[in-house]
Regions:
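Glycine-rich active-site loop/strand segments that organize a redox cofactor
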Residues: 49-95
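A glycine-rich dinucleotide-binding beta-alpha-beta segment and adjacent secondary-structure elements
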Residues: 127, 292-370
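Short hydrophobic core segments
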Residues: 7-9, 32, 131, 150-166, ...
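Feature captures the FAD/FMN-dependent oxidoreductase FAD-binding
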Residues: 76-154
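An anion/pyrophosphate-binding glycine-rich loop and adjacent beta-alpha core
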Residues: 36-38, 43-44, 52-59, 92, ...
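Glycine-rich loop(s) and the adjacent beta-strand/alpha-helix scaffold that form part
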Residues: 154-197
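Glycine-rich FAD pyrophosphate-binding loop
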Residues: 23-47
Length: 392
């Protein structure tokens, strides 16, 4: 039987950070993953450029049934700490927008940096390795694996959620949590495109590929970014963000004119452009195709001077408060994250250690902590991995 001090299951962002940090403080660390490569999600993230953190990270950027849980870890390993690591390795990066930091070159720069740190600190990495059984024993945990029997003092679960199963996502971490008496909060896809009802399919299909700056709202949350029409429904940053707050049957409200008071703008057009058709004026804000389709779907296009006060009010309402009830989401297949997971009320916010089973730790996406779009989920991976590594 092989013995080590720390076994980390899951060689993604959180697992790699935990491994290199624990090994860096002198712990003997074994990092295990069932995949044939480490950090697959890192490689595909950010369109291949890895949005590795956000300069404006704060606890308000995270969803959890236990809102205060993430505060301690985020304060002890900040975005600036990770940016310092990136700078130390000479990885060039830039801010794209809204504090989102991306590699100048490719995501493999970030993965390479983490793997280099693991090599330097002496982490033992084992890929293509499956866990068959875990048992609590005196002084730690015993694992039956395809490598043989392992024994460790500390066991860290960094297996992620259910999103993007083609990259190897499974519910393994949730099974371990249940085995050791933890409550699981219901899981669902987050940061995911919406599918739409039949009556909207024609409009979305016709506008497929069109991107529009909007204010999207649901359940007292709002995001101002682009939406993207697709053949399947609605996507784009604003839709992905609001999807984490949406539940089946909820109404989503889209303001297509976020820079204007729609009613005032329409009245202004009646004065300044009385002979212009509304679709022509909207064509200066949206694409001409979108303006024409909105005219066909929502109102009769005619010279501005011909609209009554009631018609102007009705059009303003549609443009500033387009209400729709999505049919659903595209699910885990395309979701960037998994909402829900291991109930954080049963985990120490300081150490990430289980309050049910000493020596067992949970980090990253397996926990009920989900960030907004824009590098926040990676920052949670770095911060939670670092926190556990101080104690594991």
């Amino acid at each position: 039987m092989r013995s080590t001090e720390v076994v980390i299951i899951g060689a993604g962002a959180a697992g790699l950070m935990c491994a290199l940090t624990a090994a860096g403080r002198g712990r003997k660390v074994m990092l295990i993953d069932h995949a044939n490569k480490a950090g697959k999600k890192i490689l595909m993230s950010g369109g291949g450029r890895c949005n590795f953190t956000n300069m404006y990270t704060e606890p308000a950027n995270f969803l959890s049934h236990n809102a205060h849980f993430c505060k301690s870890a985020l304060a002890r390993y900040t975005q600036w700490d990770f940016i310092g690591l990136v700078a130390k390795h000479g990885v060039p990066y830039h801010e794209k927008k809204l504090g989102q930091l991306f590699c100048d070159n490719k995501s493999s720069d970030i993965l390479g940096m983490l793997l280099d740190e693991c090599i330097q600190t002496g982490v033992s990495l084992h890929l293509d390795t499956s866990i068959e059984e875990i048992a609590k024993v005196d002084g730690g945990y015993q694992l039956q694996t395809t490598l043989g029997e392992l024994r460790c003092e500390s066991l860290v679960i960094a297996t992620g959620g259910l999103s993007i199963p083609t990259l190897g996502a499974t519910g393994f971490g949730y099974q371990v949590a249940k085995q050791f008496g933890h409550e699981l909060l219901p899981t669902r896809a987050g940061l995911v495109p919406f599918t739409i009802t039949d009556q909207l399919k024609e409009l979305c299909g016709e506008l497929s590929g069109t991107s529009v700056d909007c204010l999207v709202s649901c359940n007292d949350q709002s995001f101002r970014e682009n939406i993207l029409f697709t053949h399947r429904g609605l996507s784009g940053p604003a839709i992905l963000q609001i999807s984490s707050y949406w539940e089946t049957g909820d109404t989503v409200v889209i303001n297509l004119l976020p820079d204007h008071d729609a009613h005032t703008w329409l009245q202004q057009q009646q004065v300044e452009h009385p002979n212009s058709e509304l679709k022509t004026l909207l064509g200066e804000i949206f694409t001409k195709k979108m303006a024409n389709l909105l005219a066909q779907s929502w109102f009769v296009s005619k010279p501005m001077k011909q609209y009554t006060h009631a018609e102007v009010a009705d059009i303003a309402q549609k443009l500033s408060s387009w209400q729709l009830v999505p049919a659903g989401t595209e699910g885990y297949r395309t979701a960037e994250v998994t909402l829900g997971g291991v109930d954080t009320r049963e985990v120490s916010s300081k150490t990430m250690e289980s309050l049910k089973s000493p020596g067992l730790y949970f980090i990253g996406e397996v926990l009920d902590v989900t960030g907004h779009l824009g590098g926040f989920n990676f920052q949670w991976a770095w911060a939670s991995g670092y926190a556990a590594a101080q104690y594991a």
